[in-house]
Swiss-Prot record:
It comes from Drosophila melanogaster (Fruit fly). This is UPAR/Ly6 domain-containing protein cold. SUPFAM superfamilies: Snake toxin-like (SSF57302). Gene3D superfamilies: CD59. It comes from the Eukaryota. The keyword Lipoprotein applies.
Length: 153
């Protein structure tokens, strides 16, 4: 094989790896109305249903069980598996109306992320990690094969 052919094969392999979605279900941290991002919210992991394709995190500041003016306020964290549509709808609703971070008012914010356990942090913005270990292994093997095929002078 010529060196440009090897380069084309490597580029194609990298592209294919970036497009791979593995069958294993998404894993998200899950908890409900915890008083912080500790213990249960950092230790409970769920394999999501096949139709659930994002992890959602909600943080609220207010009183429980219902927000009420003048009551003792604190943070409440909830994490779950969701569909992208559910998460975006909730995020849009919260961010436009309720995500104020004003300490004397009740507020709520929602974050969506895609990738196994990406919702570790409360509002994470964590990047997606979709099988990059497998792709790196494949790329390393192809580079090794390419160096073996290129004639040495």
């Amino acid at each position: 094989m010529k060196s440009w052919e090897i380069a084309v094969v490597l580029v194609a392999a990298v592209y294919l790896c970036s497009q791979v979605n593995f069958v294993a279900g998404l894993e998200c941290y899950v908890c409900s109305n915890q008083t912080g991002n500790t213990e249960k919210c950092l230790n409970t992991i769920k394999t999501c249903e096949p139709f659930e394709n994002v992890c959602g995190t909600e943080i609220r500041w207010g009183s429980q069980p219902y927000f009420s003016e003048g009551a003792l306020k604190q943070y409440y964290v909830s994490k779950r598996c969701m569909t992208k549509e559910q998460c975006q709808s909730k995020r849009k609703r919260y961010m436009q109306l309720y995500c104020t971070h004003i300490w004397y008012e009740d507020w709520a914010c929602n974050e969506c992320c895609k990738g196994d356990r990406c919702n570790y942090f409360v509002i994470s913005g964590a990047p997606s990690r979709q099988g990059y270990g497998v792709c790196l292994t494949l790329l390393t093997a192809l580079l090794g094969l390419g160096s073996w095929l290129i004639p040495r002078s």
